[in-house]
Amino acid sequence: MKQEMMTILAQEEVAPRIFKLTLQGKLVGEMQTPGQFLHIKVPRADLLLRRPISINAIDQATETCQIIYRIEGDGTKAFSELTPGMQLDVLGPLGNGFDLSKIKSNDVVYLIGGGIGVPPLYELSRQLKEIGAIPVHFFGFASQSVMYDKELFEALGVCHWATDDGSFGMKGHVGMLLDQEATEIPAAVFACGNKGMLRTVDERYRNHPNAQLSHEARMACGMGACYGCVCHVTGDETGTKSVKVCDEGPVFPAGKVVI
């Protein structure tokens, strides 16, 4: 983990209220594991807490990385107003990402994402492709209007799409998409999305030997000191055992934490 003033190279609104930001700096050299996140200081004196945003793509050759975020409040609204040439105070990479150590060439791997949980799965899919694995994507969005990076994912492997309103792909949610299209027994399952989607994936694959889920949580420090992002551990009858999403996660094995 390091801290750096990174330079903004580009900013693009890829869907309504959803932005892709390209950053450049030496900090990119520390970014190796898909699924980790950056803790970014909002460039406003009245907003003290950093915002955790997952890493979407990494390019070591150009020392650049990309993040994708949705405007949810004052902090992300401030990010959306930044322009190329400006700088951001970035801390990272943080958290435990997806573990690819057991993946072999020709392994079929399921990547399951929903909405704003999709971004970290792009770098994951790209690294799986480099290993020689076969990524298969299952993605859900509210509608076609808020979809993004469709062509980029399709260049990496087979993609199955669902939208709540049926405007693109199957009409329904990701769980319904899995019921219809997830016909193989994959070597691994990786997922990132909201709690409802993760609960569906967890129930379906909790007995799989290599199923990993990236959890979302509100964070303050981002380094495990404040205990503001804890999740309870599955099977703990006392209700006292917990794990920190920012430090021990955000990626946990399926079945480990209560969703």
Regions of interest found by a model, annotated:
Residues 74-218:
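FNR/FR-type flavoprotein reductase catalytic core
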